[in-house]
Amino acid sequence: MGLYFFPKEERLKKQEDFLRILREGKPYSLSKNFVVYIRKGAEKRRIGISVNKKVGKAVVRNKIKRLIREVYRLHRPYLKEDIEMLVIVKPGENIKNLDFHKVKEMLIKIWEKAGILKK
């Protein structure tokens, strides 16, 4: 496979994994609507995405998840290997208007703040 892929092993799906990251991870955010919990020292790099039902209908929530997954997929080679992250999106004014560039900008700033980008 190429460099930019998103294998199933890197997806967080189980509730226990989400709860562990919420408990052990450190929260980072740029706004109250977009929070990323990052747990360092994991066995492998993994990501989970949670979009609150109050954000909008399923179409809107799924679009936001796809945008986050795509930013992660493209920047995956530049992230450290031993992290688990949980992206939580809550309802707010500008959340429905998110586009690829806004999501990319927010996630990169959070990743820099957390120090998980490779040098």
Curated annotation (Swiss-Prot):
Q: Which Gene3D superfamilies match?
A: 3.30.230.10
What Gene Ontology cellular-component terms does the record carry? ribonuclease P complex
One annotated GO molecular function: 3'-tRNA processing endoribonuclease activity
Entry's InterPro entries? Ribosomal_Su5_D2-typ_SF, Ribsml_uS5_D2-typ_fold_subgr, RNase_P, RNase_P_CS
Example GO biological process term? tRNA 3'-end processing
Q: What is its EC number?
A: 3.1.26.5
Known catalytic reactions: Endonucleolytic cleavage of RNA, removing 5'-extranucleotides from tRNA precursor
UniProt keywords (A-Z) are: Endonuclease, Hydrolase, Nuclease, RNA-binding, tRNA processing
Q: What does this protein do?
A: RNaseP catalyzes the removal of the 5'-leader sequence from pre-tRNA to produce the mature 5'-terminus. It can also cleave other RNA substrates such as 4.5S RNA. The protein component plays an auxiliary but essential role in vivo by binding to the 5'-leader sequence and broadening the substrate specificity of the ribozyme.
Subunit structure of this chain's protein: Consists of a catalytic RNA component (M1 or rnpB) and a protein subunit.
Family, per the entry? Belongs to the RnpA family.
Q: What is this protein called?
A: Ribonuclease P protein component
Source organism of the structure: Dictyoglomus turgidum (strain DSM 6724 / Z-1310)
Query: Mind giving the lineage of the organism this protein is from?
Result: Bacteria, Pseudomonadati, Dictyoglomota, Dictyoglomia, Dictyoglomales
Q: Which gene encodes it?
A: rnpA
